[in-house]
Amino acid sequence: MLAKRIIPCLDVTNGRVVKGVNFVELRDAGDPVEIARRYDEQGADEITFLDITATSDGRDLILHIIEAVASQVFIPLTVGGGVRALEDVRRLLNAGADKISMNSSAVANPQLVSDASARHGAQCIVVAIDAKKVSADGEPPRWEVFTHGGRKATGLDAVAWAREMARRGAGEILLTSMDRDGTKSGFDLELTRAVSDAVPVPVIASGGVGNLQHLADGIKLGHADAVLAASIFHYGEHTVGEAKRFMAQQDIPVRM
């Protein structure tokens, strides 16, 4: 069984790391280079950087931050936010990113995922899906895809969309539950399991981690291949090392 990954997520806006609840109420968590270096030292498997307002504000890529981080951090970096064209993918990879995450742009232009995967390889293309439950209690569960930092409904079914993105060459799906984001109440395990079981590529569970048990649940009950968290790491509640030791105690294979 492949080792399961623990991935701290850095949401960046205006050059600072921030964290919100349900995609709003952002508070400052510090300098991206310092925070990334700390996670590297703690033994994180990867780091994900999301420029959370680039697409909605129409801003350019955070190349200078990526260059600064890549020069000091030696684990894989996934970068997303403001990726609109094949040229953006190339520029971010050249700046030191290892994987590129697309969200709004994949919905606007699914061919971009196919083209980027064909040119650079599926292993460096991640499609991020922000999903919100839209079915009522008692109905079969259904989740809708949202874009533009969770501000725009698309009408797309999250499970079907994940399948389509994998078919087009996404090497990985980064799945965030908007209902759980920042709530510390645990992953939406039903959503995570539905997508993980539907696609042939790794799924990273995101949104809602409040304790170490939630991370383990994402793997064991959500069938995710990796778990992503922000709040519990940024504000010093837990280190990545503590998370890995906890998961190892639950017989989840991790790189120590």
UniProtKB/Swiss-Prot annotation:
Active site: D11, D130
Major localization class: cytoplasm
Places the protein is found: Cytoplasm
Keywords: Amino-acid biosynthesis, Cytoplasm, Histidine biosynthesis, Lyase
Domain of life, per lineage: Bacteria
GO terms under biological process: L-histidine biosynthetic process
Entry annotated with the keyword Lyase: yes
A cellular-component GO term for this protein: cytoplasm
UniProt EC number: 4.3.2.10
Gene3D superfamilies given in the database record: Aldolase class I
Coiled-coil annotated spans: none
GO molecular function, one term: lyase activity
Family as reported in the entry's similarity comment: Belongs to the HisA/HisF family.
Function field: IGPS catalyzes the conversion of PRFAR and glutamine to IGP, AICAR and glutamate. The HisF subunit catalyzes the cyclization activity that produces IGP and AICAR from PRFAR using the ammonia provided by the HisH subunit.
HAMAP family per the UniProt record, alphabetical: HisF
NCBIfam families to which the protein is assigned, alphabetical: hisF (TIGR00735)
Protein name: Imidazole glycerol phosphate synthase subunit HisF
Organism the protein comes from: Ralstonia nicotianae (strain ATCC BAA-1114 / GMI1000)
Organism taxonomic ancestry: Bacteria, Pseudomonadati, Pseudomonadota, Betaproteobacteria, Burkholderiales
